[in-house]
């Protein structure tokens, strides 16, 4: 298995040169007191050491051994417990957590880059941590002060973990039909009864306690999603003094045997009258849980970027060393029997596609992180509201597009290796297996597309999109002549997106099938256009800073040109599919399939 080296140079370029994050942090008072350029750089350096030195060496062995279940207990692979203890001691679980309860309060722009390192180094290990961080976010946003004081400090410290319990055997996307029940008790608690499946980290041996956030319905709850409440259910009950007490009536019935992320325990959880406490308001549980789900959706999107980065690093190293045939223009390595395969056109196409998509995704994730920071910390209400709209618009795109292109990149990386890419020892086949799930969990990518098209575009008449479009057009208007080669095709793609949006909004009023028919291609078209915007911004920064590091910045410009020449044109075929409408999708009766 190849080594992982965090792309710190590229991450610094984004934070400092493209987005000028230090200047943003200094104008947001609550961040200014915690973070500056030097602190951010030190955190990234330490994160690179932790992920490359501690987590990456456990990736292959963790996949080989997998999580093991016996008599209700789960054992993580060898080395995971020790690594998690070191990881937790470093405060990484609470990186963006509320300082009032022991979190570090760092900006999301920094956290998304750390999460990418995590997923690149060891996707299975990362899931135990990111689920805990998401549970903390939901509890901090919606829990009572008593619950926050009792649980958050240990969760931020990594002593206790968190899980998200939504799915049931009969209820996946449609959570309105869940059957898990919550019966009120005289002491203010609830008895939780039901079975949840596909629960990441529902049971493990890494932490002293596991805090489950569980969706359930009260006996008199309204039907459907309007009757869902959210409950906190600890594995071990916690006393008023914070000490662990008796085991709660929640147990792991089994774990799933999966295609990938084998070191991550995916659990069947049985709640047999377990004690739980209400989080937020009665019958408002789905809204509260979406705080965690939206965090997880961005995080899982970043899994796609991380796996793609690891695949790219491995493929580049292999392509430089593997000797096969001669370059089309004649021998390059004259002292060898053949040239390295990196000289061949299609190998270069694959590597450049991986590089352009992965670096574009890294820029997009950092941009979403910036909007999350503005939504949380900006002093001006209008600025916060605009950032919130962009976060709502971009989150489904990030989750689906990062993971779709992440799988594409990992398959390309495997292809660069040829037959060796299909062999376990080289690591590429594990990356393909591990990244595949990212298109499925935390809301399948087609559900993300429906969310984007239905709720985030059509429902508000394209208002959220207009905010994004205005920002892109303002950037283009301020660009100098050197950027024309990037700005011109960017505006062409944006015009296409804007015009298609208007057409879909108009057609959806007459035929509700239009939303579903257009949604996946529309999301991809949006993704490629957003990447074009970010590649244009990276090109602008590279031109400004070129003299400081010509090799790096010239590489950025060359990759940007490849993106605009060879990848962005995909928007035209996607637009044709969107314009085709829903008719061809309904040409067959169900019996004809």
Language-model segments: which ranges?
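Amphipathic, small/basic residue-rich leader segments at the start of a protein or domain
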Residues: 1-126, 150, 373, 583-593
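Alpha-helix capping/hinge segments and adjacent helical runs
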Residues: 2-5, 19, 91, 184, ...
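Glycine-rich cofactor-pocket loops
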Residues: 32-34, 64-76, 288-299, 313-354, ...
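Internal maturation/activation junctions in enzymes
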Residues: 80, 131-132, 143-185, 369-388, ...
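C-terminal amphipathic alpha-helical interaction region
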Residues: 101, 459, 475-593
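A structural-propensity feature for long, helix-poor, extended segments
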Residues: 133-135, 144-147, 444, 452-496
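A glycine-rich, basic-preceded beta-loop-alpha segment at the flavin cofactor/substrate interface
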Residues: 198-200, 237-253, 258, 265-296, ...
């Amino acid at each position: 298995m190849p080594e992982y080296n965090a792309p710190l140079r590229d991450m610094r370029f984004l934070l400092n040169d493209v987005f000028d994050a230090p200047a943003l942090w200094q104008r947001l008072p609550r961040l200014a007191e915690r973070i500056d350029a030097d602190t951010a750089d030190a955190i990234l350096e330490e994160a690179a050491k932790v992920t490359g030195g501690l987590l990456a060496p456990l990736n292959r062995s963790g996949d080989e051994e997998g999580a093991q279940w016996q008599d209700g207990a789960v054992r993580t692979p060898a080395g995971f417990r020790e690594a998690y203890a070191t990881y937790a001691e470093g405060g990484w679980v609470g990186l963006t957590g509320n300082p009032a309860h022991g979190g570090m309060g760092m900006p999301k722009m920094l956290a998304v880059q750390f999460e990418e390192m995590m997923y690149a180094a060891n996707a299975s290990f990362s899931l135990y941590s990111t689920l805990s961080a998401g549970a903390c976010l939901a509890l901090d946003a919606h829990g009572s002060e008593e619950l926050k004081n009792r649980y958050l400090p240990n969760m931020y410290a990594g002593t206790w973990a968190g899980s998200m319990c939504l799915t049931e055997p009969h209820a996946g996307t449609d959570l309105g039909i869940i059957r898990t029940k919550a019966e009120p008790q005289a002491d203010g608690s609830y008895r939780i009864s039901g079975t949840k499946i596909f629960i990441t980290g529902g049971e493990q041996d890494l932490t002293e306690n596991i805090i489950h956030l569980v969706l359930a319905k009260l006996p008199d709850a309204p039907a459907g999603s309007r009757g869902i409440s959210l409950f906190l259910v600890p594995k071990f009950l916690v006393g008023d003094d914070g000490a662990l007490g008796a085991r709660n009536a929640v147990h792991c019935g089994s774990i799933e045997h999966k295609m990938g992320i084998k070191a991550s325990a995916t659990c069947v959880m049985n709640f047999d009258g377990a004690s739980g406490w209400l989080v937020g308001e009665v019958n408002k549980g789905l809204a509260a849980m979406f705080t965690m789900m939206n965090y997880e959706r961005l995080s899982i999107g970043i899994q796609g970027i991380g796996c793609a980065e690891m695949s790219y690093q491995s493929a580049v190293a292999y392509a430089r060393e593997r000797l096969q045939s001669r370059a089309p223009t004649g021998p390059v390595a004259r002292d060898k029997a053949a040239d390295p395969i990196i000289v061949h056109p299609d190998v270069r196409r694959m590597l450049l596609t991986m590089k352009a998509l992965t670096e574009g995704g890294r820029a997009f994730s950092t941009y979403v992180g910036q909007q999350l920071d503005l939504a949380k910390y900006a002093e001006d209400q209008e600025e916060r509201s605009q950032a919130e709209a962009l976060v709502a618009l971009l989150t489904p795109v990030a989750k689906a597009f990062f993971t779709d292109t992440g799988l594409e990149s990992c398959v390309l990386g495997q292809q660069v290796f040829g037959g060796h890419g299909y062999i376990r020892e080289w690591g590429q086949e594990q990356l393909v297996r591990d990244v595949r799930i990212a298109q499925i969990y935390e809301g399948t990518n087609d559900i993300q597309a429906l969310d984007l098209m239905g709720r985030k575009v059509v429902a508000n008449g394209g208002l959220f999109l207009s905010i994004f479009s205005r920002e892109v057009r303002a950037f283009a208007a301020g660009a100098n002549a050197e950027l024309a080669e990037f700005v011109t095709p960017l505006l062409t793609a944006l015009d296409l997106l804007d015009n298609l949006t208007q057409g879909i909004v108009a057609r959806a009023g007459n035929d509700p099938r239009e939303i579903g028919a257009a949604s996946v291609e529309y999301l991809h078209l949006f993704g490629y256009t957003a990447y074009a915007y970010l590649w244009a911004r990276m090109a602008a920064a590279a031109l400004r800073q070129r003299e400081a590091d010509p090799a790096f910045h010239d590489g950025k410009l060359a990759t940007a040109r490849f993106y605009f020449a060879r990848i962005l044109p995909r928007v035209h075929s996607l637009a044709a599919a969107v314009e085709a409408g829903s008719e061809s999708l309904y040409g067959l009766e169900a019996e004809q399939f």
